[in-house]
Structures are given as C-alpha cells and as structure tokens.
C-alpha cells in the first residue's frame, strides 16, 4: 500500500496545558471536525473520546497520552493528548520527545498557571515549535490580552496574535483573522453556523494595531522580509503566512489563537493554523543517534528510503491485544510481520501487527512510513525509550531520561490468593511507566511501590483493582531519603584470610570526597606502579557500589560523593576479585563513619495560588512545614506563593489547604532537589526507621 499522505502533508503535534484549561475538550473537537468521531464527548460528563481509562473518566483528568490520528485539509494530523497533572510530567516529557510541534492550551481566565510553566519549560528543553490556543473565551473573567502578557512575563515566550476575539465572556461572538484581515461571526451557540464578514467598525483600529505587530514580528524572522518591512513595503498574505510558518518552526514566535472549544468556536480555525504553521517531519532537524557498531554519531532523516529507525515512547497493557508499544518512525518503513532490532537492549523482536490508534479504537495497517506514529503488537522486550531499527543497519537514538521516584508506600494484597496476581499487575504497570518502581524491602519483606507523588500512586493502586482485579491495602507514604558525606577523608582497608588453603588478600587505600548535590557517585583510579593490578580495580568499584546501597545512618542509599583509589597492595597467589570487592566495601563503610555522614531529603517546589484573605495563613502553614518561601506575586486577583518544602512535610497538604482556605486555594508541586536534613529531625528519622 503506497503512502497515503506525503511527508510534507503530515503533522505530529501534542496538545499540552494545565489541568482544566480544556485540553481534552479541544482535542475532542478536533476529532469531531476532522470526521473521526461521530458524537462529541464532554469531559465534565465523563464521556470523552480521548480519556479512555476508567479513572480518567471518573476524575475528568487525562492520565495517559492517547495517540490519535485524523485528517484535515488533505493533511494527516497525528495528535498526542498529554496529561496536565504534575504527577504525570513523565507522560508530557516523553510525548514531547516524539512530536514535531505542540499546541499549548491556556484558559482565558486563569492564563499561565503553574503546570503550564512546567510543560512549557519541557517544550523549551526539546525546542518544540508551539502555537497557543486561548480557550474558554466565553468564561466570566476571560481576557485574551492578559494571557498574552502572562506568556511574556512568565514563560519568556514571544507570543504573536494571529487572531483577535470579538467580545469576551457572554459577548464572545466571533474571531478576527489578522492575516486575511476579515472576521468570522458565529450565528448560533454551538459554532456550527458561521459567516465571514468585514471587521466590525469598533475593532478596526485594534485589528490594524495588532496586524502591524504581527508584520513586525514576522519581518524579524528573515532578512528578506526585514528589508521589505524597513523600506515600508507591505507584505503579501503569502509572505506573511510563510514568515509565520518559518518563525514558528525556528521557535522564534508563538502564534496565538483564541476560541471556546466547549462552544465549538475557533477549533476549525485552529486546525487550519496547525496545517499552515506547524512543522512537517521534513521541517525539523534530522534525529541523531549512535551507530551501534562503530559508536560514531550518525543522522537519520525523515525519508522512506533510509534504513528503518523508530523510538518506542509508550508501552500500554491492552485488555484485547496484550502489550502495545507506541512508536514514532523517524526514517524508513516497516511492514507488519517483519523483524526489527531493539538496539537499546541488543535483542531482535518480531512486529506482530501494526495498529493506528484513535483514542481507544484502532485500525490495523500493513505498513508505517517515516514520520508516522503507530502502535505495535508483539514486542516482548521493548520498554519506554528504546530504539527500534533495521537489524542490518543498527542505530541507537538518544534515549529518554526519567526522574527517580520520590515517594514510596508499602502495599499488600487483601487476600493470600492476590499475592501472585499483584506481582504480575505491578510488573505490567512498571513496564508502562518508567517513573513507577516496585521492589521488595529486604528488612520487612514488604512489597514497596514508588512514584512521583501521592496521586500517581493512588492511580496505580486504583488500576490494579480495576484492570487486574487485585484489592490491596496501602501503608503510610514513605519518603525516599538519601545519605551523603560532608567532609573528605582518607581510609585504608585490608581483607586478608591466609590460614591454610587458598587465602584471600585485598588491600586498598581510598579518598572519599563530597560532591555537589545531584552529581551522584564517581570513581577514579590514580594508583601508580601496579600497586593494584588493573584487573582488580573494577572489583573495588563494585564493592563500593554494593555497599553504598545501604548507608550507615539509616540504611538509605549514599549519593553525591567521589572515590579516588590511590594506593593498596596485592598478593600474587591469594588476591582475587572477590577479595578486592570486600576490601572496597570495608573501606567505604569505614570512610562513611569518618566523613561526617548526613541525611538528605527531597525538597519539592510548591506553588500555592490563594485569595489574598488567606495569604497569611498559607505562608504561616508553609513555614511550619519547614518551607523556604522563595517569592510572591499577584496573578489575576489571587496571590501566588512559591516555596521549597520538604516532601516529608507535604503529606495530606491538599486537605489542610482546602480547610484553611475554604477550598479556594490550589497548589502544585514537583520534585526539585535533595538537601540536608536538620540534625533534630534526622535524629527522629534514624530512630524511627
């Protein structure tokens, strides 16, 4: 089957936003207008097409990025709906890796909210071209221009209006197109009947002013247009469109649209914009990877004739077909039934069937081409972030880096029979989500689950019950503390057993040096003159790494230190790798005791949005939780407090905040850094463990 849509008519976009900005509703409307859905699903009625997991329908939030494909103006648009809740930032992060562009949805009233900033920064990190959609223009307090200003102040973005709203709140009746300089008026409440008219008299001056701003912003994207602009020549509509497209793709400008997805206003025009201004796979730089054989850097271009390469960006357990691996094809083509190499793991895999997804219905397709997003059935060893490629031309694409979990709870099944089922369920859920870990606590033999926040773990437990029918009881949340050293020391350790028979002998001298927070562990060898033979050096490193899993204060992992192996001795007959491994571990434990060990705890960056009346209470409460207030600002009638607070003090915060502010304040938090625990508190942790 030949390619249905050429590459230049393919768009891979994400829809990203803060919770409740109307992201899922916007995606729904896109699917409706592009003829993919028969009826509209309302998120607040729990019937949305994209939110297809039970928990999502119940909570009205999007948890997993559903990948969907639709058609508009003879283009294929692949859409990834990303979650807006901070516990699921990994979903956003991994979708942004495989997209070519994104539509950021902002609420016309709330504007740039905390999660919008997080998501926007992730977009900056991957240099994703973006356009903005100011949604909910029909809401009380909607203010298009305020949102534009907030994008400049809070996101350091360069928003450029390509549309202006006609009226707002109840009076939102149409949209001005600043490129064509005409207006679309909505004649009914549901946005079905429209009429193109001249720009209303009272808005002409404003439209001319913003058209001028648009032309100026566009002229800065190329020298040719700049010359024309400076000479006072008018830009043609064609030049303007080309300039907006170029500026968007180069991440110089962010075109801003407006509308009300719920009332069906502005969505078709937004789709026109996606086709006109979002990049095709040909517009973005080639993806670079490492040649699996030579280890040299190579590039893969969006071209069907190049060797096949793809990135698996999501694994999902599907009740009907088993394990589904969503992947983005960067180069080449792939047929169902063929073999690929998972170059990350060095394993060959057979692709059973290839499915193109629409929220949670699917169509089987025989072939995928460069630039496509699809899901494969039959991949056993593939996990998130793995590269799939042509077995005869192996490449490893840059993988994704996921944050470590910061919160853990003990979990046990309510019945004996549930034990095995729970093991299977947790393993499947961990395969899907790289930020979710599960392990057995060696001391207590309890099963521990760890993740990015309380909501994250709640949803895991919920899914176990719904999808795997395992009921479980959950313990109190535990914080992932770490240990470190605070001063440099030199230690030596000798492991010798030489009484009769084959002996053991290993002798090491090491320096342990504290590192900057977040650096992790580093090992260097500076021995000279063969005092320790080369083949035993890795064993010393292994011994230290084995011992650092359990620190001496409270048994937590030891981080942020450097070990220099600078001397030692060996025995021709009795030395072995094992002996040096044990000597390394003994030296580490001795060094740890001498190096003034300290406990570290995770600090969260917390942002609370509260009405002014409760500000004193909220700040007082954060201080009592050992919070460090970082700053305050006012935002559309509310006060925003930013602080760093230890995670251990944040359990149950949402309930406390609700009662302190009568439910009027909201907060978001995400992991920021590890810092030393004050002595008085570390005492409690050590005795309480």
UniProtKB/Swiss-Prot annotation:
InterPro entries: EFG_II, EFG_III, EFG_III/V, EFG_IV, EFG_V, EFG_V-like, EFTu-like_2, G_TR_CS. Catalyzes the GTP-dependent ribosomal translocation step during translation elongation. During this step, the ribosome changes from the pre-translocational (PRE) to the post-translocational (POST) state as the newly formed A-site-bound peptidyl-tRNA and P-site-bound deacylated tRNA move to the P and E sites, respectively. Catalyzes the coordinated movement of the two tRNA molecules, the mRNA and conformational changes in the ribosome. It is found in: Cytoplasm. Keywords: Cytoplasm, Elongation factor, GTP-binding, Nucleotide-binding, Protein biosynthesis. Residues 8-282 form the tr-type G domain. One of its GO terms (cellular component) is cytoplasm. GO terms for biological process: ribosome disassembly. Belongs to the TRAFAC class translation factor GTPase superfamily. Classic translation factor GTPase family. EF-G/EF-2 subfamily. SMART domains: EFG_C, EFG_IV. Its main location: cytoplasm. Pfam families: EFG_C, EFG_III, EFG_IV, GTP_EFTU, GTP_EFTU_D2. GO terms for molecular function: GTP binding; GTPase activity; translation elongation factor activity. This is Elongation factor G. GTP binds at residues 17-24, 81-85, 135-138. Coiled coil: none annotated.
């Amino acid at each position: 089957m030949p390619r249905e849509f050429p590459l230049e008519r393919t768009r891979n976009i994400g829809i990203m936003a803060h919770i409740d900005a109307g992201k899922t509703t916007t995606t729904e409307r896109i699917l409706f207008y592009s003829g993919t859905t028969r009826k509209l699903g309302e998120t607040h009625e729990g019937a949305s097409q994209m939110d297809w997991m039970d928990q999502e329908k119940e909570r009205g939030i999007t948890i997993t990025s559903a990948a969907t494909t639709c058609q508009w103006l003879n283009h294929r648009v692949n859409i990834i709906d990303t979650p807006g809740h901070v516990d699921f930032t990994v979903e956003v992060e991994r979708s942004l890796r495989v997209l070519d562009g994104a539509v950021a949805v902002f609420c016309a009233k709330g504007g740039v909210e905390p999660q919008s900033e997080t998501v926007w920064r992730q977009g900056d990190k991957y240099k994703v071209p973006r356009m903005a959609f100011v949604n909910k223009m029909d809401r009380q307090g909607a203010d298009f221009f305020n949102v534009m200003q907030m994008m400049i102040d809070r996101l350091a973005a360069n928003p450029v209006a390509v549309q202006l709203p006609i009226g707002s709140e109840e009076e939102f009746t149409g949209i001005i197109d600043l490129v064509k300089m005409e207006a679309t008026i909505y004649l009914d409440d549901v946005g079905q009947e429209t009429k193109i008219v001249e720009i209303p008299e009272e808005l002409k001056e404003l439209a001319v002013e913003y058209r001028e701003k648009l032309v100026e912003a566009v002229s800065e994207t190329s020298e040719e247009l700049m010359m024309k602009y400076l000479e006072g020549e008018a830009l043609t509509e064609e030049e303007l469109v080309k300039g907006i497209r170029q500026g968007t793709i180069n991440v110089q400008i962010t075109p801003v649209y407006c509308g009300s997805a719920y009332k069906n206003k502005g969505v078709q025009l937004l789709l026109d914009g996606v086709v006109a201004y979002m990049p095709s796979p040909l517009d973005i730089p080639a993806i670079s990877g490492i040649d699996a054989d030579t280890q040299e850097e190579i590039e893969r271009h969006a071209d069907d004739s190049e060797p096949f390469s793809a990135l698996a960006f999501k694994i999902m357990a599907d009740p009907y077909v088993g394990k589904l691996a969503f992947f983005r094809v960067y180069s080449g083509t792939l047929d169902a039934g063929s073999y690929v190499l998972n170059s990350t793991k060095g394993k060959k895999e057979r692709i059973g069937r290839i499915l193109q997804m629409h929220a949670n219905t699917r169509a089987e397709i025989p072939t995928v081409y460069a630039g496509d997003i699809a899901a494969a059935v039959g991949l056993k060893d593939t996990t998130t972030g793995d590269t799939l490629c042509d077995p005869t031309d192996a490449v490893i694409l840059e993988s994704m880096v996921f944050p470590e979990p910061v919160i853990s709870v003990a979990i046990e099944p309510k019945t004996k029979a549930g034990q095995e089922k729970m093991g299977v369920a947790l393993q499947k859920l961990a395969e899907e989500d790289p930020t979710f870990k599960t392990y057995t606590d060696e001391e207590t033999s309890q099963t521990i689950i760890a993740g990015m926040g309380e909501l994250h773990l709640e949803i895991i437990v919920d899914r176990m019950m719904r999808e795997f029918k395992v009921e479980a009881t959950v313990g109190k949340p535990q914080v992932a503390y770490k240990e470190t050293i605070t001063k440099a020391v030199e230690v030596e350790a000798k492991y010798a057993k030489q009484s009769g028979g084959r002996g053991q002998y290993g002798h090491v001298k090491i320096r342990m040096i504290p590192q900057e927070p977040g650096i992790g562990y580093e090992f260097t060898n500076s021995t000279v003159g063969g005092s320790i033979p080369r083949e035993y050096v890795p064993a010393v490193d292994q011994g230290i790494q084995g011992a650092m899993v359990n620190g001496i204060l409270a048994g937590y992992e030891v981080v942020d230190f450097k070990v220099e192996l600078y001397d030692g001795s060996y025995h021709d007959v009795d030395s072995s790798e094992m002996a040096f491994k044990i000597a390394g571990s003994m030296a580490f434990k001795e060094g740890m005791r001498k190096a003034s060990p300290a406990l570290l705890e995770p600090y969260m960056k917390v942002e609370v949005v509260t009405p002014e009346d409760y500000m004193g209470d909220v700040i007082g409460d954060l201080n009592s939780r050992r919070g460090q207030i970082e700053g305050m600002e006012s935002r559309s009638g509310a006060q925003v407090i930013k602080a760093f607070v230890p995670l251990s003090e944040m359990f149950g915060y949402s309930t406390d905040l609700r009662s302190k502010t009568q439910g009027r304040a909201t907060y978001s938090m995400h992991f920021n850094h590890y810092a030393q625990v004050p002595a008085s508190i570390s005492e409690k942790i050590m005795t309480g463990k």
